[in-house]
């Protein structure tokens, strides 16, 4: 009986440890398809991203990312995958939007943020 309880305890410890380790080594979020110049320059993608920004993001970031509750964005310093990861996974006080917006919608937000229409 003692051997059985020890085995169960060891098994549970290993399972819990594996779950913790999996959370610590979470893979970075990637868009379902690579960002292309054409995608980022598409008027329909920029327009859709602008609508999402106006509906959701501006409440913290402001109309064009400044002034708002959140820090000022500097889109000319960002790469598309970096912005996508921030929108998808969140960062510090910014919530993750992975369960709210589709992959395509999050990609459209990126297109808008990196567009000339967005830049403050």
Question: Can you annotate each of these PLM segments?
Answer:
Residues 24-52, 120:
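Electrostatic cytochrome c docking/interface patches
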């Amino acid at each position: 009986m003692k051997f059985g309880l020890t085995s169960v305890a060891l098994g549970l410890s290993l399972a819990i440890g594996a779950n913790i380790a999996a959370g610590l080594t979470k893979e970075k979020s990637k868009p379902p398809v690579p960002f292309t110049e054409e995608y980022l320059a598409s008027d329909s993608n920029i327009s859709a991203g602008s609508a999402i920004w106006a509906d959701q993001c501006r409440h913290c970031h402001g109309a064009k990312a400044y002034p708002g509750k959140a820090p000022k964005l500097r889109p000319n310093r960002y790469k598309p995958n970096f912005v996508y990861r921030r929108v998808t996974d969140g960062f510090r006080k910014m919530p993750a939007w992975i369960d709210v917006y589709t992959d395509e919608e999050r990609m459209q937000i990126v297109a808008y943020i990196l567009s000339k229409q967005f830049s403050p």
